């Protein structure tokens, strides 16, 4: 299997503010030269990744991760989610997906060598059931044309979708399990280039829009794909919507709808009932209502509001609503960012869980039930 052999696990029973640091890991092997890389946000030198050769004597699946308790919220005790297992091996977490049928949380990580690792964990125990390196379309050389950043991940249970700045990669669950079992790179069933058309404008303001696959989510037969943009650069990110093929899981390229203007510095996105929910680099949780039909996908950005209630930390990434809570993945616990974090915050090494009633839902005139629906 594609093995993270150097990460011993332990169970944490004490109450903590954020996350318990995992044990130190052995130095990874030097991998081959990296493929071209496209960044979503601010960059800096990254640490070397973990050895993914699959050669080793330990179990291919990590020991159960800790699920510790956070300080009480206004609604009572709010335990944190699964531990982000691969932080100390040089991996930086990005996307968060949720498989409701299996009660599993998916996390994508990128490494210094521009590899992308998919980790699948049990929602309750945090134990890792699958880890696999993601590749491209070529069955003989799947490492060619592979994703290099893995900014977003989502699943409908049968197919797993990964956004990677310039493309959307589709994998079958069957292929991911096969590759994990055999210690090989998972082969994509589809790689669709995200359009980079010139002259894309915000329909409401005429502002230039940046089109990329920085983050994504899927819901009710559609894929929603958004792009990151810096604050104050005179541009904004675009969010597109694509219909999914029911049989193959592929994105239907000529079904594109939009764009909707994304918030500045958007990093993660999920779809709730009639709205998009974004995490941003300036610690917001932006609620954006939209209108959609078989032929259109539009939104009035004047209706968007921040419902974070001050509960989002720096370096927020992927996001989902799970069992009446907002689950947020952070990159602040990674080797790349932990020393850059404002000292008033602790690096987050577990997924954050926020009860929906603790958010500023009144600002959006919604209830927890409406968000969860």
Locate the predicted segments by residue.
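Beta-propeller blade signature
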Residues: 116-124, 173-189, 236-246, 287-296, ...
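Beta-strand-rich domains and repeat architectures in extracellular enzymes and scaffolds
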Residues: 82-116
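Short coil/turn segments that connect the beta-strands within blades of beta-propeller domains
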Residues: 101-103, 157-158, 220-222, 273-275, ...
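Repeated scaffold domains used in trafficking and secretory/extracellular systems
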Residues: 90-97, 143-152, 195-218, 262-270, ...
């Amino acid at each position: 299997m594609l093995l993270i052999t150097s990460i011993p696990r332990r169970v944490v029973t004490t109450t903590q503010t954020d996350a318990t640091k995992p044990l130190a890991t052995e130095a990874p092997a030097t991998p081959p030269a990296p493929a071209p890389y496209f960044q979503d946000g601010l960059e800096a030198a990254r640490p070397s990744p973990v050895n993914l050769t699959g050669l080793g004597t330990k179990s291919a699946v990590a020991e159960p991760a800790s699920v510790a308790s956070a300080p009480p919220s206004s609604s009572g005790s709010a335990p944190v989610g699964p531990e982000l297992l691969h932080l100390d091996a040089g991996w930086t977490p990005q996307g968060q997906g949720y498989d409701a049928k299996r009660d599993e949380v998916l996390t994508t990580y990128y490494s210094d060598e521009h590899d992308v690792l998919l980790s699948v964990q049990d929602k309750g125990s945090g134990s890792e059931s699958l880890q696999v390196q993601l590749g491209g379309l070529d069955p003989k050389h799947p490492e060619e044309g592979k994703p290099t950043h893995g900014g977003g991940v989502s699943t409908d249970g049968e197919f797993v979708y990964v956004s990677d700045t310039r493309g959307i990669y589709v994998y079958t669950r069957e292929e991911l399990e096969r590759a994990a079992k055999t210690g090989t790179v998972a082969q994509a069933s589809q790689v669709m280039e995200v359009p980079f058309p010139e002259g894309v404008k915000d329909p409401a303001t005429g502002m230039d829009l940046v089109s990329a696959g920085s983050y994504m989510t899927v819901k009710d037969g559609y894929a929603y794909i958004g792009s990151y943009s810096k604050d104050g650069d005179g541009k904004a990110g675009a969010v597109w919507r694509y219909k999914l093929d029911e049989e193959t899981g592929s994105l239907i390229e000529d079904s594109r709808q939009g764009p909707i203007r994304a918030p500045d510095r958007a990093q993660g996105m999920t779809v709730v009932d009639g709205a998009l929910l974004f995490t941003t680099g300036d610690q917001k949780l932006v609620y954006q209502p939209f209108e959609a039909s078989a032929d259109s996908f539009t939104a009035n950005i004047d209706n968007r509001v921040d419902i974070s209630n001050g509960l989002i930390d720096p370096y927020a990434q992927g996001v989902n609503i799970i069992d009446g809570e907002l689950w947020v993945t952070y990159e602040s616990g990674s080797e790349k960012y932990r020393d850059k974090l404002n000292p008033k915050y602790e690096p987050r090494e577990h997924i954050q869980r926020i009860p929906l009633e603790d958010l500023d839902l009144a600002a959006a005139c919604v209830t927890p039930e409406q968000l969860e629906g």
